[in-house]
């Protein structure tokens, strides 16, 4: 069984490095559990800290502009901010935004400090970053332990024994230089207390084929029905169809009235229902990346249902419940949520020259793998993945290059490449399109009759430039490292069979913060274009797009933009 707050290595033991520098540190991508929010309106703020409702920052601006409200904390260099006064074991996470050159640290109860950013993994100034810390207090038999320090989804420290301290101090944050903003501060005291138990046996039924729709079950072939004392994927032992659906139903008795957090972990597909209401909808994913929800419950019994569909991922199913000051308590059997096999991470570095790897890539929320993906690692530490079928720039990241364990370990059946650094997901569609209607929706995919990949060429440094045909025109696409990100240059030649549009960015939110500079997806990354250009910012179906018309003159045109992250 996997404990989401244990110090066990979720991604294997010591990494095996393949590439160019065998002694370089390699960091593992880490998933995080959502924590109860800290009431920042109840904190006592020193004079150099203030509450705010919004923050405005530029990558070159040394100070932060704030708006009225109480959802953020903004601090300048000076006195420490106390978050928790008498901590024991705890989990803490926060989003942090920094001005250029800013630095800040968190002081643990033992007096040791940990940084809130990392030179190799930190995002550009003015972008939101994530910090996740797990800590175990000292006991009579052992010193305190920093279970985990994760910055931007990458584990930097794990299972670190700390020097013994004569005192148990508060948790504080100190700004050393510049200014920072904090939001979504989550905190959980990890007390070992049982807060719920099954009121009786659970009923479960198994059906052939996978689905997440309960109303589909009566139409599927029934395979098995029985009871169990706790949720257990192993109840399906002996079922012959590889793909099937399990429905668990039971009554959960909770000890207190309060806000309970449920954490659902699974490999495959799953849904959680509490008192008849669907509270978690989880589609295809691997074990480890939990989905969480907070629910207000009265003391006593509540109906709980878990629908689980086995797909191609390694199967497993676990459900945890907790109050704001307790460790997550498992509502499943030990064998239902297996620990991953202790496999060393096989990492590829790109320290001496660019490295190109063809592989499959599976994006979060997608069922199908991207089977024609090219990932490029650069000595500058700026890496990216392109879907050659769609000529879509899928993801960009900083830090170490590629985790190829699922490609090269044993049979390598998944054939999946995963980023080893701080990853940023982009809109996974082509950036160029021929659209006869300027108001037409951007296509989710493009057929081979419109877009055809032609190949790639390497420059003297070993960086690729891809070539493809698009609606009668020929396009070369060159992505190169820049000081703070990647520059993408697309040259078009020939004659397109309609107006050509470049979609520079797409996401839930696009904000112009300076002339030619846009923050995307709640300051997840920036895009920069020539300030003289006049793009169109469109909103449709709750999403925004930044579109740029491309005019071919004398059979040629160039589009260039920069991604800063």
Q: For the regions a protein language model found, what residue spans apply to each?
A:
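N-terminal secretory signal peptides that target proteins for export/translocation
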Residues: 1-10
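Bacterial N-terminal signal peptides
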Residues: 12-24
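Carbohydrate-interacting regions of secretory-pathway proteins
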Residues: 29-253, 329-334
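Beta-strand-rich N-terminal accessory domains
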Residues: 30-41, 84, 333-476, 485, ...
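Acidic (Asp/Glu-rich), glycine- and aromatic
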Residues: 104-109, 316-325, 492-512
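Solvent-exposed beta-strand/loop surfaces of large extracellular or lumenal domains
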Residues: 156-166, 234-235, 272-294, 512-549
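Extracellular/secretory pathway-exposed regions associated with glycan biology
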Residues: 186-261, 265-349
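Beta-strand-rich recognition/accessory modules
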Residues: 470-471, 482, 487, 495-507, ...
């Amino acid at each position: 069984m996997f404990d989401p707050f244990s110090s066990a290595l979720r991604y294997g033991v010591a990494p095996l490095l393949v590439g160019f520098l065998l002694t370089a540190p390699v960091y593992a991508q880490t998933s995080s559990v959502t924590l109860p929010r800290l009431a920042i309106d109840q904190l006592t703020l020193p004079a150099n800290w203030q509450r705010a409702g919004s923050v405005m920052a530029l990558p070159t601006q040394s100070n932060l502009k704030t708006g009225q409200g109480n959802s953020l904390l903004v601090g300048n260099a000076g006195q420490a901010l106390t978050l928790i006064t008498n901590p024991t074991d705890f989990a803490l996470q926060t989003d942090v935004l920094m001005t250029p050159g800013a630095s800040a640290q968190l002081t643990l109860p033992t007096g040791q400090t940990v940084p809130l950013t990392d030179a190799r993994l930190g995002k550009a100034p003015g972008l939101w970053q994530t910090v996740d810390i797990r800590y175990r207090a000292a006991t009579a038999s052992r010193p305190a332990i920093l279970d985990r320090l994760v910055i931007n989804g990458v584990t930097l420290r794990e299972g670190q024994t700390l020097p013994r301290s004569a005192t148990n101090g508060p948790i504080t944050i100190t700004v050393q230089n510049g200014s920072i903003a904090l939001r979504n501060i989550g905190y959980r005291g990890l007390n070992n207390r049982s807060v719920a138990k099954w009121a009786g046996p659970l009923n479960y039924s198994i059906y052939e084929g996978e689905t997440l729709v309960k109303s589909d079950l009566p139409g599927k072939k029934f395979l098995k029905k029985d009871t169990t004392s706790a949720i257990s994927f192993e109840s399906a032992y002996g079922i012959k169809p590889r793909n099937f659906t399990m429905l668990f139903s039971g009554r959960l008795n909770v000890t207190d009235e309060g806000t309970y957090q449920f954490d659902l972990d699974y490999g495959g597909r799953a849904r959680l229902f509490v008192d008849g209401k669907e509270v978690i909808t989880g589609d295809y994913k691997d074990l480890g990346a939990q989905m969480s929800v907070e629910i207000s419950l009265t003391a006593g019994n509540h109906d709980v249902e878990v629908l689980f569909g086995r797909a191609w991922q390694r199967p497993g199913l676990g459900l945890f419940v907790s109050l704001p000051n307790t460790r997550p308590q498992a509502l499943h059997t030990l064998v239902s949520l297996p620990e991953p096999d202790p496999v060393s991470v096989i990492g590829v570095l790109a320290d001496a020259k660019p490295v190109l790897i063809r592989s499959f890539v599976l994006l979060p929320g997608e069922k199908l793998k991207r089977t024609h993906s090219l990932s490029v690692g650069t000595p500058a530490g700026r890496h990216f993945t392109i879907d050659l079928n769609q000529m879509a720039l899928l993801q960009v990241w900083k830090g170490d290059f590629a985790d190829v364990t699922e490609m090269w370990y044993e049979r390598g059946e998944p054939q999946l490449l995963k980023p080893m650094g701080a990853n940023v997901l982009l809109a996974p569609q082509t950036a160029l399109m021929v659209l006869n209607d300027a108001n037409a929706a951007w296509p989710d995919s493009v057929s081979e009759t419109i877009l055809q990949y032609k190949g790639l060429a390497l420059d003297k440094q070993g960086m690729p430039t891809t070539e493809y045909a698009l609606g009668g025109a020929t396009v070369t696409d060159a992505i190169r490292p820049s000081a703070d990100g990647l520059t993408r240059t697309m040259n078009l030649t020939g004659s397109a069979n309609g107006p050509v549009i470049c979609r520079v960015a797409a996401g839930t939110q696009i904000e112009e913060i300076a002339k030619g500079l846009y923050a995307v997806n709640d300051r997840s990354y920036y895009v920069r274009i020539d300030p003289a250009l006049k793009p169109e910012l469109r909103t449709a179906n709750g999403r925004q797009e930044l579109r740029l018309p491309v005019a071919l003159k004398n059979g040629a045109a160039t589009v260039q933009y920069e991604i800063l992250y």
